[in-house]
Amino acid sequence: DMTIHDFDMARYITGSEVVEVFAKGAVRVDAAIGAAGDIDTAVIVLIHQSGAITTIGNSRKAAYGYDQRVEAFGSLGMAASDNTHQFNSTLATDTGYRRPPLENFFLERYNRSYLDQWAAFVDMVTNDGPSPASGAHGRAPLVIATAALKSMRENRPVRITEVDAAIEGNVES
């Protein structure tokens, strides 16, 4: 549940579908999560149709606040999106660097994105325009998540084709 949006972002950023997944997970933070049959720490490698490789590191806890960053590396350079801090300031002294804490709640971190999505939705409904997302866009991360869970349980890479047909229903684009 904590990585589904990362799967969606990987497809969007690379512009390529995922063809294979390898996932490892552990309980490293909260034993109660393990007792409930879940994990709190995961590392996932996605292989894309284009040959691009995505690595995702995920944990339910970062001691310094909610940490969500993305970096894309390629032959022409790198693009990155860093964490959002409560204030955009840094103090540098002879003892090192200090910054305000990271934004903690998702509404604070993604306020601008939610407003943009609502505006696009209202525009689509008002002007009877096409949806920028299809059922297939929603289904793809679910298929990747299913492959990741199978990979983690079986300790092996899993091809998307192994789980795609097993997911009930066929969502058309």
Kindly give the residue locations of the regions a language model identified.
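C-terminal substrate-binding/catalytic lobe of Rossmann-fold NAD(P)-dependent oxidoreductases
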Residues: 64-66, 73, 82-83, 116
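Rossmann-like dinucleotide-binding domain that binds NAD(P)(H)
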Residues: 1-53, 59-64, 136
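A general structural signal for well-ordered alpha-helical segments in protein cores
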Residues: 6-7, 115-119, 145
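Short acidic/polar mixed-charge low-complexity motifs
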Residues: 17, 50-52, 75-78, 129, ...
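C-terminal helix-rich "cap/oligomerization" subdomain common to oxidoreductases
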Residues: 49, 123-173
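Short polybasic amphipathic segments
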Residues: 70, 86-98
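Active-site loop of classical SDR/Rossmann-like NAD(P)-dependent oxidoreductases
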Residues: 63, 106-118
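Beta-strand scaffold of nucleotide-dependent catalytic cores
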Residues: 55-58, 81-83
